[in-house]
Amino acid sequence: EIIDKMKLFYEVIVPYDYLKDILLKHGVKCKALNYWTSSLIRSKPKVIHKTRDPSKLVFLYNGTNDIRKNVTTLTRIFANVLENTEHILIVKTNKPDNLTITKNIRVITERISDEQLASLFNLCDYCVTCTRGEGVGLLHLEGHYFNKPIISHEQGVFKQLGVDIIPLPYNEVDI
C-alpha cells in the first residue's frame, strides 16, 4: 500500500540510491539526493569477500543503543542463542547501557574510523537488527554495500519494499 501511494506522486525524493533502486523496481518515479547517507559508503571502502565458516559465524549490529532500536532485546536473544557456540555478535554502538554481554558478545562503544568500520563489515557474515522503527536504515544500506545478508524484522516498510532480508521470527500479541 505504501508503494501504491508513492506512485501517485510525480517524483519521490529519497535519501540514497539503495532505496531509489528498490523503488524503481516497483515502478515508483524517484530520485536520490545522496546527501544524508553513510559516510562509510561515501568513502567507497574495499569490499572483501569472506567465506562463511558455519561453526564460527560473526554477526554485526551497527547503530545506536536506544529504545527504538531494541538493542537490549537483540543482545539478550543472542546471549541465549550463541551460548555454547563459537559464534560471535559484535555490537558497534554508542553506549553499553542494559546490554547483555557474554563471551560471545563484543560491544564496541568507542568512535572508530570508517576504515575500521569497513573492517567490521568485511569481517562479519551477517548484519542483524531487532528494530521495528526504521524505514530502510543505515545498517541495511551498509550491509547491502558489503554484500552481507541482513537479519531484520519484516514488519512495516521492509516487507512492502521487498528489501532482501532474513526475517526475525515474531508473534503478534493483542494489547
Task: List the predicted regions and their residue ranges.
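A short, active-site helix/loop in glycosyltransferases that binds the activated sugar's phosphate group
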Residues: 10-30
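A short hydrophobic beta-strand element within the catalytic core of glycosyltransferases
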Residues: 127-128
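Conserved catalytic-core segment of nucleotide-activated headgroup transferases in glycan assembly
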Residues: 46-116, 122-123
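Short beta-strand->alpha-helix junction loop in the catalytic core
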Residues: 33-44
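Short glycine/serine-rich donor-binding loops of glycosyltransferases
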Residues: 137-140
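Aromatic "clamp/platform" in nucleotide-sugar-dependent glycosyltransferases that forms part
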Residues: 132
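Short hydrophobic beta-strand element within catalytic cores of glycosyltransferases
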Residues: 149-152
